From Swiss-Prot:
GO molecular function: rRNA binding; structural constituent of ribosome; transferase activity
Family annotation (PROSITE patterns): RIBOSOMAL_L2
Protein name: Large ribosomal subunit protein uL2
Residue numbers spanned by region Disordered: 210-278
Family annotation (NCBIfam families): rplB_bact (TIGR01171)
Compositional bias ranges of the Basic residues kind: 210-220, 257-278
Amino acid sequence: MGIRKYKPTTPGRRGASVADFVEITREHPEKSLVRPLHSKGGRNVYGRITTRHQGGGHKRAYRLIDFKRADKDGVPAKVAHIEYDPNRTARIALLHYADGEKRYILAPARLAQGDVVESGPGADIKPGNNLPLRNIPVGTVVHAIELRPGGGAKIARSAGASVQLVAKEGMYAQLRMPSGEIRNVDIRCRATVGEVGNAEQSNISWGKAGRMRWKGKRPSVRGVAMNPIDHPLGGGEGKSSGGRHPVSPWGKPEGRTRRKHKPSDKLIVRRRKSNKKR
C-alpha cells in the first residue's frame, strides 16, 4: 500500500492524503458473504445516546470474516481477491477453498492474489497460514490471536498490528503485545502468521472534517466551550479553564474508566510502560 497526497487546490485538499488502493483486486464484495448493517447512530434500543460523536456516514454492508478457521484444517485455499472493507482498517482476502467454499480472512502483509494458504498444526510458517501457538516457532510474528481456544481471533486485528511469540512455558505461550506488554495465552489458541497488512493506514491525513463525517464520526465539542447548562466546565467570562478537574458531562472524573482488577490480569507477565509523568 502507498499513500497519495493531494495538491492544495482547496483548503480541504491542502495536506490531505488517501490510500492508493493498488493492492485491491476487486471492487465489489462476494454477495454470499455480505450481510446488511443497520447504523445505530450511537443510540440504544430506547433511542438514547449511549456513545457520543457517532452518526451519519456512508451506508455500509458487513462482510463476514472467518476469525476461527479451525474447521478448515488441512483444506488448502487460494487467494482469489484482496478487497476493501469499510468496517475495518485492514484489507480482507477472499479465499476459495479446495472443497468449493468461499470465506473472507484479514489480509496479512505480503499476501497476494493467487497465493495458497492453509490452516492446521501441519501448516507451513508463512503469511496467512493459521496454526495453534504450540506449533509456531518462538520469535515468529503473528496476528489474529485467540484469547481462549476456539473463541475466535481477538488480538491484533487492525491494520499493521502484530504480536511476537517470545516464549513457551507449559500450557502457556508468552506474547509481546504492540504496547510492550507480555501476556500469557493458552498454547492451544490459534494465530495467523505474519502481520496485518495496510500498515500505512495510520499515516493518512484526512484533510477536512467532512471526510470524518463520511466515516460516521461527529464533532467532539470541548466542555469549556459549552454553556453551564450543558456541561460542568461550561460558562465563565471569556475563555476559562473550567475551574475544576476535568469531568464528563455528567460530573464523573475524566479518565480511569478501566477496572482495577480484571480476572485476566493474572496472565500479564510484564505490564506495558506507563506514559505518566513522574
